[in-house]
């Protein structure tokens, strides 16, 4: 990785200068904005000037003088203190060989012996997945792919909230619809689940059990008055809807490794184990058991067991995270939540602290709100159900590739707006089309005639050829940056930039030169490598690379 090579040489040069604190100083190595200055640059001299009471140019010159000779074709200085590096043709040749021989493995890093557990989606199994869940699912899925490619072992996980009031309400809603199917005069309460999927669960329940529950009723609290029937209906409804959730996720190419049940955690004895572990940080007040989360930075203490003896939502969640940390080889946890859970972060980290875990090994990322617009008007309701847009609706409207692109190309720090007209357009205004077209165009060039490959780059002197080479060099660094910063959108940004350079190259440079077969071979090799890297980047996002546009 060329950026790593430059960073290593910078550290050697700085060590010769007596500067050894570079671990605290983030060395930026990036592509130059203007190719005439060089291929890559660093701003380290400007950072160090503030610490060493020297001008940036003076430090940059001293660094350059301490570089080993012949490492780069050229090292030059640019005010106010940039160090620019022009690469040798051999660096480019080695890159093209690596891409060609590694093919779809290009971009993968060596194993790091660290295992991440990434939990995402984790919607209550009370209905179909909706528009907000799509953003959560796609972010988590692409992040998992990134971390795997970056060398980590990764397990993905879904926390099934199959206990508590919402599941009782689900069973009650299904029972009412089931009884209505048999012409029983009973009304569904206003605060019950009214979605189309509840009708489908009830119909399937009837097909399976016939009239077994026909005499079951609700009490004055709108609770099912038969404990056995209540449990059977709950189990049936959760299983049915969880299967629908898995189908929804599969429709957007998302497959989660492990589904962990809250009921299982509750019945496994793990909650009692956790309560024993954190006992030194608990106290009783007003008949309730509290955890002293303020000891670890929370704004107030939190209830674990209510005065009626029931657990709060917090308690099984603590046990669940303890379970995840205790899985074989699990080192770090990442939870992907919605923004409505922002206030929950401090208390969960405090609980991990109380359990003796490093709270920094639990990362929590919150997905932002997303919306769909068409003709500047927001889509809010599904035509099919009259309710919030589901993942099924989104796939039907714009397709899974477009959904993965537009959600995967958005920062988690900003609201996501998907313009349907742009997402469906087949022109350069659609960034996904633009990138897929670059792959198809490269494929078209390579299939047009028989060509030879030549990994040398001495004849690739066009500005756009150097820009393409530098962008290819930066692919692995982009993966590292995206993985380390938990920013999957860096991949789509990279692909768009690569596509843009390639489209400009195609429009301005004749790739096949009948008068110079060696030049043609070098250009075909470059195009082959561009196509491969486009395909590899799209694979991280689980998006189809087209060989021809339709």
UniProtKB/Swiss-Prot annotation:
A motif ('HIGH' region) lies at residues 123-133. One of its GO terms (biological process) is arginyl-tRNA aminoacylation. It comes from the Bacteria. Its EC number is 6.1.1.19. InterPro entries: Arg-tRNA-ligase, Arg-tRNA-synth_N, Arg-tRNA-synth_N_sf, ArgRS_core, DALR_anticod-bd, Rossmann-like_a/b/a_fold, tRNAsynth_Ia_anticodon-bd. Keywords: Aminoacyl-tRNA synthetase, ATP-binding, Cytoplasm, Ligase, Nucleotide-binding, Protein biosynthesis. NCBIfam families: argS. HAMAP family: Arg_tRNA_synth. Belongs to the class-I aminoacyl-tRNA synthetase family. PANTHER family: ARGININE--TRNA LIGASE, CYTOPLASMIC, ARGINYL-TRNA SYNTHETASE. This is Arginine--tRNA ligase. It comes from Ureaplasma parvum serovar 3 (strain ATCC 700970).
């Amino acid at each position: 990785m060329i950026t790593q090579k430059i960073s290593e040489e910078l550290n050697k040069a700085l060590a010769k200068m007596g500067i050894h604190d570079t671990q605290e100083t983030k060395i930026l190595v990036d592509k130059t904005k203007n190719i005439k200055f060089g291929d890559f640059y660093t701003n380290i001299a400007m950072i160090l000037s503030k610490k060493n009471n020297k001008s940036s140019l003076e430090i940059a010159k001293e660094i350059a003088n301490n570089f080993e000779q012949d490492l780069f074709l050229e090292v030059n200085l640019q005010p106010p203190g940039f160090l620019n590096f022009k690469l040798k043709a051999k660096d480019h040749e080695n890159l093209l060989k690596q891409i060609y021989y590694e093919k779809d493995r290009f971009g993968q890093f060596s194993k790091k012996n660290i295992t991440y557990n990434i939990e995402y989606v984790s919607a209550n199994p009370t209905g179909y997945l909706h528009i907000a869940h799509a953003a959560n699912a796609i972010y988590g899925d692409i992040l998992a792919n990134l971390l795997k490619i970056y060398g980590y072992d990764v397990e993905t996980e879904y926390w099934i909230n199959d206990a508590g009031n919402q599941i009782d309400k689900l069973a009650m809603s299904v029972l009412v619809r089931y009884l209505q199917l048999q012409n029983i005069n009973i009304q569904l309460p206003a605060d019950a689940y009214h979605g189309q999927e509840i009708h489908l669960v009830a119909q399937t329940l009837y097909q399976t059990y016939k009239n077994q529950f026909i005499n079951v009723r609700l009490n004055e609290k709108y609770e099912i008055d038969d404990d056995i029937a209540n449990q059977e209906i709950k189990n049936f409804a959760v299983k049915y809807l969880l299967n629908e959730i898995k189908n929804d996720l599969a429709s957007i190419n998302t497959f989660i490794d492990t589904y962990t049940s809250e009921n299982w955690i509750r019945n496994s004895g793990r909650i009692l184990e956790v309560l024993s572990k954190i006992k030194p940080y608990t106290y009783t007040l007003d008949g309730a058991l509290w955890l002293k989360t303020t000891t670890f930075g929370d704004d107030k203490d939190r209830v674990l067991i209510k005065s009626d003896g029931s657990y709060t939502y917090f308690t099984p969640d603590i046990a669940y995270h303890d379970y995840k940390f205790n899985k074989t080889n699990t080192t770090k946890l990442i939870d992907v939540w919605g923004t409505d859970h922002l206030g929950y972060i401090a208390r969960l980290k405090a609980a991990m602290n109380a359990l003796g875990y490093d709270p920094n090994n639990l990362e929590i990322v919150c997905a932002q709100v997303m919306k769909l617009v068409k003709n500047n008007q927001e889509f809010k309701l599904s035509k099919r159900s009259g309710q919030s847009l589901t993942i099924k609706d989104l796939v039907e409207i714009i397709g899974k590739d477009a959904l993965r692109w537009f959600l995967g190309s958005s920062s988690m720090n900003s609201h996501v707006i998907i313009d349907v007209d742009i997402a469906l357009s087949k022109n350069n205004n659609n960034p996904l089309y633009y990138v897929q077209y670059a792959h198809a165009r490269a494929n078209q060039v390579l299939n047009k005639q028989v060509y030879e490959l030549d990994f040398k780059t001495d004849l690739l002197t066009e500005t756009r050829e150097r820009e393409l080479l530098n962008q290819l060099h930066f692919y692995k660094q982009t993966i590292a940056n995206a993985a380390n910063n938990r920013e999957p959108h860096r991949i789509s940004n990279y692909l768009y930039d690569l596509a843009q350079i390639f489209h400009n190259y195609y429009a301005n440079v004749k790739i096949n030169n009948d008068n110079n077969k060696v030049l043609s071979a070098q250009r075909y090799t470059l195009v082959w490598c561009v196509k491969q890297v486009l395909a590899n980047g799209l694979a991280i996002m689980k998006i189809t690379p087209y060989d021809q546009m339709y």
